[in-house]
């Protein structure tokens, strides 16, 4: 299949709003042009309202508005809220801790995330080596691949996902393939696969993990604080590891 194998037909949905506006404009024009024909224009107006109403209901039903309202009504609703996703109140603690611990500002070190979307760290002003992007150099992809190569070797799913696509330039673990957000539910990495030498060569200083890493010392990671960073109602608990020098 080549390049077609990575093509996602659902991306067509990105231009669907434009198509709906074109249909709306055409429909309004049709009603205006035939406003003298009461029956025809009335039927068209009814059809237009029906389509717009159904579309609006579908958007509301499947949008983030619904999940956020559900989350406000029931904190146990199994979808991430805005504060959950961005780890509000948690990564603020991490930032303050590293400032006190190292005396360095955020631009002086680089971080990666495990089990938490890198966007959360980026949102809090951290300088990230990982992220979700469809526009970064092939050279960087190859360099980052060295960091996660041990995990890719253990999971064909992860290997194909990164090598054949690669927009998610994330840390992966074969113990939980396909899970990019790990809730504080007792899960921990028993044997994380990670090349910390390659991570250090890439400039990585700290790793934020939403799960405890049992083999951290073996990997060359130093847990900076035994107690994880969290709040009473946070989705994540974050362990901060320092990447050892080569």
Question: What does each model-identified segment do?
Answer:
Residues 60-246:
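Extracytoplasmic
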Residues 20, 33, 212:
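Residue-level marker of positions within ordered structural domains that often coincide
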């Amino acid at each position: 299949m080549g390049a077609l194998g990575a093509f996602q037909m659902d991306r067509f949905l990105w231009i669907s709003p434009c198509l709906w506006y074109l249909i709306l404009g055409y429909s309004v024009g049709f009603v205006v042009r035939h406003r003298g024909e009461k029956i025809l224009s009335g039927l068209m107006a009814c059809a237009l309202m029906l389509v717009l109403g159904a579309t609006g209901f579908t958007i509301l039903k499947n949008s983030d508005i619904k999940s956020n309202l559900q989350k406000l009504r029931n904190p146990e609703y199994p979808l991430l809220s805005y504060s959950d996703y961005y780890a509000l109140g948690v990564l603020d603690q991490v930032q303050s801790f590293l400032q006190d611990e190292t005396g360095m500002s955020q631009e002086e070190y680089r971080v990666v995330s495990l089990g938490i979307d890198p966007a959360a760290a980026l949102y809090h002003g951290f300088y990230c080596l990982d992220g979700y992007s469809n526009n970064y150099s092939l050279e960087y992809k190859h360099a980052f691949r060295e960091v996660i190569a041990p995990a890719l070797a253990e999971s064909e799913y992860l290997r194909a996902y990164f090598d054949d696509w690669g927009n998610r330039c994330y840390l992966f673990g074969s113990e939980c393939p396909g899970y990019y957000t790990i809730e504080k539910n007792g899960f921990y990495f028993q044997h994380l696969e990670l090349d910390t030498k390659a991570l250090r060569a890439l400039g990585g200083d700290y790793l934020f993990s939403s799960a405890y890493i049992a083999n951290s010392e073996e990997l060359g990671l130093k847990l900076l604080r035994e107690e994880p960073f969290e709040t009473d109602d946070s989705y994540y608990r974050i362990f901060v590891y320092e990447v050892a020098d080569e």
